[in-house]
């Protein structure tokens, strides 16, 4: 039980740190970049620009009516995040599975806070070479993508060496 509580504390610190980093960088981006000027670095490989994203990932759903967007990106997303948090505490996940869930949860929660507080999500980073560029994103999006990669790695590894204890229901907190 003591080991389990240590893991929970470490995960809480990781989630709070990820959210904190995202919140701080979004605040700085708002203060420095909101004027509309694009800052380019490393031969235009890295661009910093302020964007208020009303949609989801890469702006998907931005053209939906306001009521649909609010329901989809705030209410439903909030429920999904809550379920993820409960499941993360309930199951004895380990390794890449636990890492992935926590990163997705942290990034999703930070973007959800933006959406609830502002109605939009602040994005400010863009990477690329020449005409090949990413969409504009933020630290929370990076956490989500790293989390998805960790979940994929966990799924790949579990098909090769299944460990039933990775998903045993845990004891109540």
Q: Could you tell me what each predicted segment is?
A:
Residues 1-173:
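Alpha-helical transmembrane bundles and membrane-interface segments of multipass inner-membrane proteins
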């Amino acid at each position: 039980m003591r080991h389990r509580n240590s893991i929970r504390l470490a995960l809480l610190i990781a989630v709070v740190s990820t959210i904190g980093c995202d919140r701080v960088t979004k605040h700085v981006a708002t203060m420095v970049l909101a004027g509309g000027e694009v800052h380019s670095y490393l031969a235009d490989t890295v661009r910093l620009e302020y964007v208020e994203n009303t949609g989801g990932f890469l702006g998907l759903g931005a053209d939906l009516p306001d009521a649909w967007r609010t329901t989809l990106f705030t209410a439903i997303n909030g429920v999904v995040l809550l379920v993820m948090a409960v499941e993360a505490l309930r199951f004895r996940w380990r390794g890449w599975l636990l890492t992935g869930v926590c990163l997705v949860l942290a990034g999703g929660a930070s973007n959800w806070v933006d959406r609830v507080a502002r109605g939009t999500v602040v994005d400010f980073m863009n990477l690329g070479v020449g005409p090949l560029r990413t969409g504009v994103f933020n630290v929370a999006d990076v956490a989500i993508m790293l989390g998805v990669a960790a979940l994929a790695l966990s799924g790949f590894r579990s098909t090769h060496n299944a460990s039933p204890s990775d998903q045993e229901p845990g004891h109540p907190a």
